[in-house]
């Protein structure tokens, strides 16, 4: 059956090296538990939330940490990693953007491009390493019938030479600690979906396995 509507060809898309990009978040300005000074967090219900988490873990119950990318963009990755290492967090659940910022920190030591400038000059999201490596990892994961998070964590673990900053990567730490890290993807919403090597079937399969 012939396709009625023309499909866009991504093969001619031009990408840029992320090494040349200015990043708003770097491993040098990340916050560190017990080191970085901060104001006391005051929010109604926060103390109760903490108490419930502590109670849950004391009773052997899981704590599923559901988050978006701004946890990473606000330089808080090390706090999440510390909570995993302490045995507080037993499951990471996040969206695609979270995995991208986390992945970029691992290989580049920085993430969060200057969006207004990047949109203006047409470079937004067109980063070769991020798109190529993440899609490579995901497609490998699809062939192995493993989830999105495990596929990325295993890829980072297999290529230490590419990821000198992986100690600050949430998904890699989850992989090493044998904590599930699941990523729940909306197709077409992440920058790696516009990369020439993107395989939507592989992304859907791996994210579906995570679900």
Residue ranges, per PLM feature:
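Metallocofactor- and cofactor-centric catalytic cores in central/energy metabolism, strongly enriched
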Residues: 1-129, 133-143, 150-211
């Amino acid at each position: 059956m012939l396709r009625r509507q023309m499909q866009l060809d991504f093969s001619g898309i031009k990408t840029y090296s992320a090494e040349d990009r200015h990043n708003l978040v770097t491993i040098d300005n990340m916050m560190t538990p017990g080191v970085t000074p901060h104001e006391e967090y005051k929010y109604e219900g926060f103390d109760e939330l903490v108490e419930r988490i502590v109670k849950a873990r004391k009773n052997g119950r899981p704590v599923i940490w559901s988050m978006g990318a701004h946890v990473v963009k606000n330089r808080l990755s090390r706090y999440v990693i510390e909570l995993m290492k302490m045995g507080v967090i037993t499951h990471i659940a996040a969206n695609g953007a979270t995995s991208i910022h986390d992945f970029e920190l691992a290989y580049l030591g920085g993430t969060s491009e200057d969006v207004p400038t990047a949109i203006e000059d047409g470079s937004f999201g067109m980063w070769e390493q991020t798109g190529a490596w993440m899609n490579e990892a995901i497609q490998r994961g699809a062939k192995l019938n493993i989830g999105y998070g495990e596929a990325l964590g295993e890829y980072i673990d297999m290529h230490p030479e590419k990821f000198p900053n992986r100690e600050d990567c949430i998904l890699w730490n989850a992989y090493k600690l044998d904590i599930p890290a699941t990523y729940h993807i909306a197709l077409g919403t992440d920058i790696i979906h516009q990369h020439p090597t993107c395989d939507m079937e592989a992304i859907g399969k791996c994210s579906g396995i995570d679900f």
